[in-house]
Each structure stands twice: as C-alpha cells, then as structure tokens.
Amino acid sequence: MLPANGQTAVIQSKTSSHGLPLVVAHGRPLPPLPTPYHVRVRVLAVGLNPTDYKMVTHFFMQDNTAGCDFCGIVEEAGPQSVLGLGLRVCGADFPYRPSNPYNGAFAEYATADSRHLLRIPDGVSDLQAAGIGAIGWGTAALAISDPAALDLPGLPSRPDSRGLPVLVYGGATATGIMAIQMLKLSGYSPIAVCSESSAPLCMSLGAIGTASYTSVTCAEDIKAIAKGSKIKHALDCITDVESMAICLASLSRTGGRYACLEAFPDAWLTRRAIAVKVVMGFEGQNVDVDLGHPVYTRKANPALHAVAGEWARELQLLLNDGQIKTQPMQEIGGSFEGVIKALEMLQRGDVKGKKLAIRIAYSK
C-alpha cells in the first residue's frame, strides 16, 4: 500500500549540514507516472554513481530528489507497462533535471519506464541488482550503438563477426565493466585501460588485454595488444586530459571515433579526424534535459530511447543466463543517511574498484 503521508527521500537542500547539499526529507509527494509505460517501484536497495555527487555539486536544484540506480518491487503499473505487479526489477531514473522534482532512486518509491527495467533472477541479491541498475549499462549502450558515438552495429543476439578492437579507458569503472562485457558478447575485442590491480577483473569480463594507465608507454601497449589491427573506436569512461590523450594516441592515423562521458576543453582535442561525442546516459529516457550548459543540455531523442530499449532486452537475456557481472559490491549501512555518507566517500575518492550499495527496505 502506498504511504498516505508521503515518502522519505534524499533531496537537494542548501540547509544541509553535510559536505554535500543533501538532506533526508519526510512527507515528500510520490512521483507521478509520466507515461502509460511507467511503473512505480518500492525501492529495496540503491546503487551509487559518481554522477550522484557531481550533479548536486555542479547543477544544484533545490528540493529535487537525488539518485539514479535502484532495485525494487513493482507496486503500480501504467496501462501499457510491459511488467506486472510484484516483480523484482532494477533500473534507473535521471532525476537531475528541473522538470523532475519528485522522482529519484534515493527514496521509498521511484518511477521508471518499464521498457528499460530488468527483471531480477532469484539468484541475484537486491544489492547486486542495485549495482546493475541501469546507469552503467545504459551509458555503455548509447556509447556503443549511437550512430553519433561509436556506431558499432553488433549486439549479443547478432554479434559482429569482424572482432574489431575497441579501447575502453577506465575499464574497471561501473560503465567500463558493463562496456567490456557488452562489447565482448557483441563480437568485439575490448582492450581495457585500468590499474594493474584491476587487470584480472577486466580480463575475466572479456578484455583481450589490459594496459596500465600509469605506464609511460600506455598508448604503445594498447597498440601492441591489438596486434596490428587498427583501433578505430575508443570509449573513455574517465575523461581527463591524460585519458583523452592516450585514447587519441591509440586511435588509427586514418581517424576513428571517440566517445567520452564528460565535457572537455577544446584544447584537449588534438586530432581533428576523430569523430567525438560526449555521451549522456539520460538521452536514453527520451526527455528534454536543460542544465544550462551546452554540452549537458539535450532534447528528447526517440531514436536513442529505442537503442536503450533494445539493449534492455539484450541485457535481460544475458542476466537470465548469468552472463552479467557487476563491480565488486560494498554495502554501506544507515539507509538514507547512509546514502549521503557513501556519496561523500565517493566524492573524497575513498572508494576504488567497488560499487557502493545501500539497503533501503526488505521484500515483504
């Protein structure tokens, strides 16, 4: 039964006594179902992403709910929902936009498009499911399949037989881990740039080789792993001056495609024959997002919404077969207060190579 007196949620607030402008608020309105395809989910656990502290820091919106990745139980469904009541699912919403004040994962209830949610098999825990969420795989999906990004046609259901090498810089990040698996299962040969300690994980996920980002010969090491095959596709999950330089140096002299996840100064782009796109995972939701910044402001894109839906169907089959792995998980206690504590840990850089998850409720 839905709460009569509103819900508890983590919201953005200038009155916060924390390092981040976040507080736990009570009596919050439940988010509406914005389309007939949406469902309302009772949140069981949430997964944290760097975007959750970056957005509230750089694009603060007073009183907006926070949080993207969640796992929960479907308790209300729109008339065209593809999911029934009572199902345990994982997914995400992008709450960091002015037109979406009440929806977000860090709450007792969240809404999401049923076509982009994954049904959770019995062998996957709530915390693991929150770690899968949708931000990581959704961002990777758009980077891989968007014609303006890497424009790679392969999918797990119809792999590309060419085995093209694809560079994944930040292979041990949440998005990188999903990208390596999705690329490998789609017929590609992912090459991961990561720390030496994360190399075994990236190899176990399907990377054909790894290069250390601390190596002075990183770009040469990447090319050696490709064994003479020209690298024409790079996904940069870090997006700083060093990562971009290595990606551009690794791409073929004849050009290629570079997808990254954050805006960058024009001076970093030292090669003009490279097609570049800054990938925003929220483009898969088919909503207008205006953050007052030219790079991060996007119009609703039905084509990318369809890409995300297609990959959701692909991921569902892989999840059912046990073929999808997440980052190593670390549970943080404290429910909603624990969410704020964990985000501050992420912001300080206290967490390396792990996905933080917080229990919000238990299945009834």
From Swiss-Prot:
It is an enzyme of class 1 (oxidoreductase). It catalyses: 7 malonyl-CoA + acetyl-CoA + 10 AH2 + 5 S-adenosyl-L-methionine + 2 H(+) = dehydroprobetaenone I + 10 A + 5 S-adenosyl-L-homocysteine + 7 CO2 + 8 CoA + 6 H2O. NADP(+) binds at residues 51-54, 172-175, 195-198, 213, 261-262, 351-352. Pathway: Mycotoxin biosynthesis. Pfam families: ADH_N (PF08240), ADH_zinc_N (PF00107). It comes from the Eukaryota. GO terms for molecular function: nucleotide binding; oxidoreductase activity, acting on NAD(P)H. Disulfide bonds: none annotated. Signal peptide: none annotated. Its EC number is 1.-.-.-. Keywords: NADP, Nucleotide-binding, Oxidoreductase. Substrate binds at W137, G138, T139, A140, A141, L142, A143, I144, G281, F282, E283, G284, Q285. SUPFAM superfamilies: GroES-like, NAD(P)-binding Rossmann-fold domains. Trans-enoyl reductase; part of the gene cluster that mediates the biosynthesis of the phytotoxin stemphyloxin II. The first step of the pathway is the synthesis of dehydroprobetaenone I by the polyketide synthase sthA and the enoyl reductase sthE via condensation of one acetyl-CoA starter unit with 7 malonyl-CoA units and 5 methylations. The C-terminal reductase (R) domain of sthA catalyzes the reductive release of the polyketide chain. Because sthA lacks a designated enoylreductase (ER) domain, the required activity is provided the enoyl reductase sthE. Monomer. Belongs to the zinc-containing alcohol dehydrogenase family. This is Trans-enoyl reductase sthE. It comes from Phaeosphaeria nodorum (strain SN15 / ATCC MYA-4574 / FGSC 10173) (Glume blotch fungus).
